[in-house]
Amino acid sequence: MRFDILTLFPAMFTGPLTESILKRAAQAELLQFHLHDIRDYATDKHKMVDDSPTGGGAGMVMKPGPLALCTQTVLSADPNPAPVVLMTPSGRVFNQTIAREWAQLPRLVLVCGHYEGIDERYIERYVTDQVSLGDFVLTGGELAAMTIVDAVGRLVPEVLDPESLLHESHDDGLLEYPHYTKPAEWNGVAVPPILLSGHHAKIAQWRHEQRLRRTLERRPDMLRHATLSKKDRQLLKEWGWEEKSEGKNQKAEG
């Protein structure tokens, strides 16, 4: 999968894209990262990429010209079509469902906004989607783009062992279960005995119940969309879940 990232600060991506899983995936040619400095596409002698807001106001706005030229060049560099996604607090909230969808694509173009924003004429002409990491504001889109590259890239086939992706948080509407490793007792706290029993079915059941409990305690809103069996719903109610308050449209399994 190819990622094209349009940014005013390409150096910010050096660490995240050259370490750990993303580095190995790039070396294995499973992922490609192409950084494009928007300033290189400014045509005036001062390489201006921003200007004051029309109509007045604070800050600066990114000019449409350099962004448009950069986008046109990037899109023409590869025959595969690609969504052009703007990082903006005004966009829909990025989540695991979107990450899974995008991981099936051959290519993704990410546009990093900065300053007060981007000229709306560029957005209307070139941007096909707009996403946010949540209800807060960053100084620019670079950190959001890094997060999206990591979240999407790790889901691309062969980047990770498929087993590593099973039962992750948000994978099926539930949070992940707690993890433990050696030693069996640390600082006076023991690993749950069931995990040392060797009984795989009981371990799987314990982990599933932990996922239910953790989701109820930390993100009860997620239960609205989770696929819950009758036994799951019974357990949750025993733990204080009020099903009606979480919505009436939960998907159910027998």
Swiss-Prot record:
Keywords on record: Cytoplasm, Methyltransferase, S-adenosyl-L-methionine, Transferase, tRNA processing
Top EC class for this record? transferase
Q: Which GO terms describe its molecular function?
A: tRNA (guanine(37)-N1)-methyltransferase activity
Q: Where in the cell is it found?
A: Cytoplasm
Q: Which GO terms describe its cellular component?
A: cytosol
Indicate where this protein is primarily found: cytoplasm
Q: What's a BP term from Gene Ontology annotated to this protein?
A: tRNA N1-guanine methylation
Enzyme Commission identifier(s) = 2.1.1.228
Q: Name one Pfam family in it.
A: tRNA_m1G_MT
Q: Which reaction does it catalyse?
A: guanosine(37) in tRNA + S-adenosyl-L-methionine = N(1)-methylguanosine(37) in tRNA + S-adenosyl-L-homocysteine + H(+)
Q: Which InterPro entries does its entry note?
A: Alpha/beta_knot_MTases (IPR029028), tRNA_m1G_MeTrfase_C_sf (IPR023148), tRNA_m1G_MeTrfase_TrmD (IPR002649), tRNA_m1G_MTases_N (IPR029026), tRNA_MeTrfase_TRMD/TRM10 (IPR016009)
Instruction: Summarize where S-adenosyl-L-methionine binds, as residue positions.
Output: G113, L133, G134, D135, F136, V137, L138
The entry sums up its family as follows: Belongs to the RNA methyltransferase TrmD family.
HAMAP family hit by this protein: TrmD
Its subunit composition reads: Homodimer.
* Task of the protein: Specifically methylates guanosine-37 in various tRNAs.
The protein's name:
tRNA (guanine-N(1)-)-methyltransferase
Which source organism does the UniProt entry give? Answer: Herpetosiphon aurantiacus (strain ATCC 23779 / DSM 785 / 114-95)
Q: What's the name of its gene?
A: trmD
